[in-house]
Amino acid sequence: GSEVTEKAGFTADATITSGLGLHDVTVAEHALALILAAARRLDTAVRAVDEQRWAKELSVNQPLNNATSFTIVRGSRIVIWGFGGIGQRLAGYLKALGVEVIGVARSAGERGGFPVITADDLPAALETADVLVNILPASPETAGVVNAELLAHLPAKAWLVNVGRGATVDAQALTAALRAGTLAGAALGATAVG
């Protein structure tokens, strides 16, 4: 991301270019894969195969809607925080699967046919979300913004999918929410590095 370039100490006359849009497709597809894996509990299924057992917990009494558990993508409500190129591409994929998508960006309105809210309205949107997808870049303003206060707005059945920078997620708050059962799961494409 640009944060690495900014910290590199280049002189003011150095030319810096952008790869804007270069990874939109691959990151959006990765986010989609994580969402589908969360809904279908592929982690549990793979573990069962490794243990050479039938994953009874995945085949008996699964809800046919998302009222108590996020198990079906169609009809779910997914909030995408970071609604630039990657977020809008992901929104298109999700719309094709029958998902209600809400984008979160610096300014509210509509982008690509999707409703977009600001971070000020994010807590209210999370109250009924099945998934929060974080695609935020790392910056002083975004450091640790996915914190305990924000996670508390998600229902206990919800998942966090992070394909944004790891530094945007408060790892201790996420771990605490998962251990307390106030968040159903997390699919992390990125984590903070030491």
Where are these regions (language model features)?
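An N-terminal-biased, well-structured beta-alpha scaffold segment characteristic
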Residues: 1-17, 147
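Residues at the starts of beta-strands that form the adenosine-phosphate
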Residues: 77, 91, 99-100
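Conserved N-terminal Rossmann-fold NAD(P)-binding element of oxidoreductases
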Residues: 78-82
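Rossmann-like adenosine-cofactor binding region
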Residues: 107-194
